[in-house]
Amino acid sequence: MPKVILTGSICQHVGGLSAVDVSGTTARDVITTLEASYPALRGWVVDEQGALRRHVKLFRGGEAVSLDAPIAPGDELHIVAAISGG
């Protein structure tokens, strides 16, 4: 089962957890399953049109990946939200 590693402000939407084991065969599947388990996360990673939000990046094995990237059992998918300020 893939492991999702959450950073920064994303953690607050999953009860403060920084890592969660989630099923799925693509990054999109994994995020959909994660959102089903943690409804407060909906809209923070993927927008209403199903696109990755501009301030969020996904990484697998140190490489940036898209929502359509395959995710294998044992992979770690890092969801990283950018920090901004002024």
Predicted regions and their residues:
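Ubiquitin-like/PB1-type beta-grasp interaction modules and other compact soluble beta-rich domains
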Residues: 1-85
